[in-house]
């Protein structure tokens, strides 16, 4: 008997020391419970319960010898022989079978298909007992933290130490409807994905996503291998995913860089129109070289003074860089201007573009687009030049001619007039003249004020 009491004490220590066996209970809900005390070790006449294999959560009046442990009713120690514990102490098998697919049947936990016939009579025998004792259930325990639902028994077959006790939870709080079907077996080393294996992991439920509102769009099916590989390295298989092809194209969580079937058809014609543009670029290279040489000759004969607009005029390098684009972007630039007028004003924007002669192979649509763009650009240049010309004419004569330098005293007026006619004023020079004129006016105002 000493060995039996020692085994019982270790069993109670196991229940108390293991944190997962103790359910957290909110404060203020513990009823008045008796402390756990070991039985009289000298007494050999310990009363035995009618069924020593039951662990009940119901506080019933018919079982006074049971001790309450945090909502669980444990039998009096010494009722389970130690030989059965010693043989099965190394094995703990917990098999759960959740049948949540049928909403009309209550949910239950059992050993699965092989063990349902063993515990069928026990489930029927304790169903009436669970319904009667559910009213007297204390507020503490495992079942007190779950929301109440419809009535029905819930049985849990827990094969511990080869002793088949039945842990009856509150049936009114576990019977709730969940859409879907889930069959969970034990922990085999490898789960075979076949329709003939009863222990296969099978979960089938409708996935709700922004792109898959209909229930027939996608679902998990563990029996049909598809996209995922069993390469996790722990020996257990993972559930497979089977997704229709139309769901992949409309999936909002798909990768952005992944091309779909419709995108592949649209990518091909994007690069095809560039081939004739390259051919035209090769044909235009000798013409650009000739235009560059003509522009160099015209700039050398036009005079020694250069303006900002001459430096900003397109050259052969700008034509070569823009020729890689389409013909529309290349038509935005204009060639070098012809001989400049010998007037003391800004350069006129009435230059004619040579793009109309350089592109004989262009279509009528390209020519119309180029002509309209050139017209808008010419109007912009004309308005801007008109504003600078009005600013230049508003400046006094000494400001406009004072930019030539102070060493012009030995030069007659005729030569100065000739230089003024040949000289072209840039926009930057006009702004500099206006700044100096404003400074002179401010100095005069300060002198008059003092």
UniProtKB/Swiss-Prot annotation:
Pfam families: HLH
bHLH domain span: 368-441
One MF annotation (Gene Ontology) recorded for this entry: protein dimerization activity
Gene3D superfamilies from the UniProt entry: Helix-loop-helix DNA-binding domain
Compositionally skewed regions (Polar residues) per UniProt: 31-46, 291-304
Bias type Low complexity, positions: 101-112, 305-341
InterPro entries hit by this protein: bHLH_dom (IPR011598), HLH_DNA-bd_sf (IPR036638), Regulatory_TF_Diverse (IPR052099)
SMART domains: HLH
Basic residues bias spans: 272-286
Region of interest (Disordered), residue spans: 18-87, 99-148, 185-377, 398-426
Top-rank lineage group of the source organism: Eukaryota
Keywords on record: Allergen, DNA-binding
Segments of skewed composition (Basic and acidic residues): 113-125, 356-377
Protein's name according to its UniProt entry: Allergen Fus c 3
């Amino acid at each position: 008997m000493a060995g039996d009491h020692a085994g019982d004490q270790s069993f109670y220590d196991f229940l108390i020391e293991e944190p997962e066996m103790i359910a957290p209970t909110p404060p203020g809900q513990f009823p008045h419970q008796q402390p756990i005390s070991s039985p009289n070790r000298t007494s050999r006449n310990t009363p035995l319960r009618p069924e020593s294999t039951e662990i009940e959560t119901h506080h019933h009046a018919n079982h006074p010898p049971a001790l309450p442990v945090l909502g669980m009713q444990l039998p009096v120690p010494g009722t389970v022989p130690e030989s059965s514990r010693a043989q099965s102490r190394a094995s703990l098998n917990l098999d759960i079978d959740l049948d949540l697919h049928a909403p009309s049947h209550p949910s239950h936990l059992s050993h699965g298909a092989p063990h349902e016939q063993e515990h069928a009579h026990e489930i029927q025998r304790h169903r009436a007992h669970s319904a009667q004792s559910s009213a007297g259930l204390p507020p503490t325990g495992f079942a007190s933290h779950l929301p109440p639902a419809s009535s029905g028994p819930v049985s849990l077959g827990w094969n511990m130490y080869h002793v088949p006790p039945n842990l009856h939870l509150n049936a009114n709080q576990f019977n709730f409807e969940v859409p879907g079907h889930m069959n969970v077996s034990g922990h085999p080393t490898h789960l075979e994905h076949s329709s003939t294996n009863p222990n296969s992991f099978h979960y089938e439920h409708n996935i709700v996503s922004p792109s898959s509102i209909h229930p027939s769009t996608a679902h998990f099916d563990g029996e049909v291998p598809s996209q995922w590989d069993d390469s996790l390295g722990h020996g257990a298989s993972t559930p497979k995913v089977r997704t229709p092809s139309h769901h992949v194209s409309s999936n909002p969580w798909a990768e952005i860089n992944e091309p779909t079937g419709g995108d592949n058809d649209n990518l091909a014609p994007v690069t095809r129109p560039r081939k004739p543009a390259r051919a035209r670029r090769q044909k235009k290279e000798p013409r650009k070289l000739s235009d560059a040489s003509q522009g160099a000759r015209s700039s050398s004969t036009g005079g020694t003074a250069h303006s900002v607009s001459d430096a900003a005029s397109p050259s052969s390098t700008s034509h070569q860089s823009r020729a890689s684009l389409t013909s529309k972007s290349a038509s935005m630039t204009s060639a070098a201007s012809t001989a400049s007028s010998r007037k003391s004003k800004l350069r006129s924007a009435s230059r004619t573009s040579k793009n109309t002669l350089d592109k004989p192979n262009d279509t009528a649509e390209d020519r119309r687009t180029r002509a309209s763009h050139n017209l808008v650009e010419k109007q912009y240049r004309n308005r801007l030049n008109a504003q600078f010309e009005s600013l230049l004419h508003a400046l006094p004569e000494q400001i406009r001619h004072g930019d030539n330098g102070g060493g012009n005293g030995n030069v007659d007026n005729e030569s100065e007039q000739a230089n003024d006619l040949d000289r072209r004023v840039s926009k930057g020079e006009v702004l500099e003249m206006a700044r100096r004129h404003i400074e002179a006016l401010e100095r005069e105002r300060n002198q008059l004020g003092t």
